[in-house]
A protein has these predicted regions:
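ATP-binding/phosphotransfer module of carbohydrate and carboxylate kinases, centering on a glycine-rich
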Residues: 1-57, 62-66, 70-106, 117-134, ...
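Short clusters of small/polar residues that mark proteolytic maturation junctions
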Residues: 59, 110, 226-227
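Short glycine-aspartate micro-motif
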Residues: 80-84, 137-139, 199-204, 212
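Hydrophobic "anchor" residues
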Residues: 105, 151, 221-222
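Glycine-rich phosphate-binding loop and adjoining helix at the ATP-binding site
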Residues: 108-192, 286-295
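Short glycine-rich anion-binding loops that position phosphate/pyrophosphate groups of nucleotides
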Residues: 143-145, 208, 279-280
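Glycine/GP-enriched mid-protein hinge/lid loop-to-helix segment characteristic of carbohydrate kinases
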Residues: 174-265
C-alpha cells in the first residue's frame, strides 16, 4: 500500500507526463486529462511552479472572457545530455546533444577523432556541462554491448572493456544510462511513430563493422540477459568474423542480410522490419523479400520499411529512455 508521499509523487508524475507534450494546459484541463481533482492539481502545480519545474502564464483562451493561467514545463529547468560515438566508413566521431524537458534540441555538435577513447568522451562531456549546468542525466549510446556499464565487443577497439558508466558517474556526479545504439534507435522509432502495439525490429547494416538489430515488442525493448539480443553478426554464416567483415560490402553482403532476415522473422515474427545502414538501398528490399519467400510463407512476412537516416530517432530514443528513468526514479 502506498503512503501519502508515494501517492503525491505518483500524482505529480501524471501531471509531468501530460506536460511532456510541450503543450500548455489550464488546471481544469489537467484535472480532466489526469483524473485528479482541480484542487489537487492546484496544489501540485503550485509546488512544481515554486520549484521551477513548470511555468504558469496568463492567457486568453477565447476571443472573449477572462484570462486563465496555463501551465507548461519550464524548458530551462533541467536538460538531458545525449552522447553517442560511432565508426562509420572509417571515420570515428562523437556527437553531443542537449535536449530540453520536452525533447527540443538546444545544442548539438559532432567532432571527429583519430583516437576516440574514454578520455575524449569525458572531455567532450565536460565541455558541454560548462555551458549547461542544469543537465540532470547523461545518456550514452555505444556501438557495442554495454553489459553492467562496461563496453564489450566494441566497433572502437580503444573502448574495449572500458567501464564507461561508473567512470562517468564518478567524474560528473550525475546518473548515466549506457546502452547499445540500436536499442535507442528502435525505441525512438517506436515512440515517435506511435507503434506501441506492434513488434518492430530495426536492422542496421553499416559498412566496415558487424551488423546489429534491436526489437521492441509491444512497447517493451527486448535486450536479453546480457544485452546481447539482436547481435546477428554472431550468427553462423559458415565463415569467421573476419571473413564476414570482408563480405560486408555491396553486393556480397546481400546473402548474409537475407540469412539474418529469415532468422529474425522466424524467431521474432515482427509486424515491421525497418532496414537501415549504408550497405542497403531502398531497391534492395524487394529482392530481400523475394528471397525470404523461399523459406517463409507470404502471410507471415512483415512489412519491410527502408529508413535512410536514424539520427533523429536515435536522439529521441535517448530522450525517451531518460524520461522513463526519471518517471521511475521519482
Amino acid at each position: 500500500m502506498k503512503d501519502s508521499a508515494g501517492i503525491k509523487r505518483e500524482n505529480k508524475t501524471q501531471i509531468w507526463k501530460l506536460l511532456l507534450s510541450g503543450q500548455a494546459y489550464t488546471k481544469q484541463q489537467i484535472a480532466l486529462q489526469t483524473g485528479l481533482s482541480v484542487a489537487s492539481c492546484n496544489t501540485y502545480l503550485n509546488e512544481m511552479e515554486l520549484r521551477g519545474e513548470v511555468i504558469g502564464q496568463k492567457q486568453k483562451l477565447h476571443d472573449v472572457g477572462r484570462n486563465a493561467v496555463v501551465y507548461s514545463l519550464n524548458e530551462e529547468f533541467e536538460s538531458t545530455l545525449c552522447v553517442f560515438f560511432q565508426w562509420i566508413q572509417g571515420v570515428k566521431s562523437i556527437t553531443t546533444a542537449v535536449l530540453s524537458p520536452t525533447g527540443n534540441i538546444r545544442y548539438e555538435k559532432t567532432k571527429s577523432f583519430s583516437l576516440l577513447d574514454a578520455g575524449v568522451i569525458q572531455g567532450e562531456i565536460a565541455a558541454v556541462l560548462e555551458q549547461f549546468a542544469n543537465v540532470s542525466q547523461i545518456v550514452v549510446g555505444t556501438p557495442s554491448i554495454a553489459e553492467k556499464g562496461v563496453i564489450r565487443h566494441s566497433d572502437l577497439p580503444e573502448l574495449e572493456n572500458v567501464p564507461l558508466k561508473p567512470l562517468l558517474e564518478e567524474r560528473f556526479q550525475r546518473p548515466v544510462i549506457l546502452a547499445n545504439d540500436m536499442h535507442y534507435k528502435v525505441y525512438g522509432y517506436c515512440r515517435q511513430e506511435q507503434l506501441s502495439h506492434q513488434v518492430v525490429t530495426l536492422v542496421n547494416y553499416p559498412s566496415g563493422v558487424l551488423p546489429g538489430t534491436a526489437t521492441v515488442h509491444k512497447g517493451v525493448l527486448l535486450t536479453g540477459r546480457n544485452l546481447f539480443a539482436g547481435m546477428v553478426g554472431f550468427l553462423d554464416y559458415g565463415m569467421s568474423l573476419e571473413q564476414q567483415l570482408e563480405k560486408l560490402h555491396r553486393p556480397t553482403a546481400e546473402p548474409l542480410i537475407v540469412q539474418a532476415t529469415i532468422a529474425l522473422i522466424s524467431i521474432l515474427n515482427p509486424h515491421r522490419l525497418v532496414f537501415t545502414g549504408d550497405l542497403l538501398e531502398e531497391g534492395d528490399l524487394a529482392r530481400i523479400r523475394r528471397a525470404c519467400q523461399k523459406c517463409i510463407p507470404e502471410e507471415y512476412l512483415p512489412e519491410f520499411v527502408f529508413l535512410p537516416d536514424t539520427r533523429d530517432y536515435y536522439l529521441m530514443g535517448m530522450y525517451w529512455m531518460a524520461m522513463d528513468r526519471k518517471e521511475n526514479r521519482e
